[in-house]
Amino acid sequence: MGRKSRLKRERRELKLHGVSDNSSRALVLLDEHSQSVYRFFQEEWQADALARGDVWLSTLETCRAYENPEQGDAEEAHETYNSGHAVGGSGDPELVEVARRSGIHIGPGCSNITISNNTRKSVLPDAYVLCTTTDFSPEKLGETFGRYCVEITNPRQFFIAVSEVLEGIVSIREAAAGKVIYKDRFYTGMEQPPGPIGFVKPPDPYTNQKEFRFLWIPKEANELNPFLLKCPEVGHLCERIA
């Protein structure tokens, strides 16, 4: 199934769950993961809060600032593209694509164009984020993220419900939920992009975390601060298990 067809199907399903038309256009489910995900906490009260439906939303900027290298990632939601060396004209689709990826527009009737070693860095300035894992492994994650844990039994319904409540407070441009892809965030030439920005992290040291991420990008993303979102609608989806 192509990306456009998949997105149309997802939006139809989101509407069936009671999501408004405007909201469903902004929500993207990146994969078909339907099993539980888990959120670990350092403090017991934090776990109890989520089990009641009080959802602590962090921000990308907060995640970038953590000193612990297994928690913090200064390059969170960054992506770097390098053109390599390409020669051609307007009729060469690969050159046109390399130019587009480099931030260069090639109009009709152009020839003898050379693009060499052009680097473009894309950054998602900030967004609200909730990081969970698909792997309940206290022995691996407890020391870094805490020994208290809440199971979110239906991440799809959780994402939809939290998005609806958040939309009532903040105007959301786009939101996505899915597994993090563990790959280099650099690509070149005609290589496939590593994945959706905000959902790609380097394998070392993160791959063992098996992260499942919820991400909400506000239309106005300046000076975002973490906050507690009261969302009793998800209380029945959140169970304290440790």
Where are these regions (language model features)?
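NAD-dependent ADP-ribosyltransferases
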Residues: 4-242
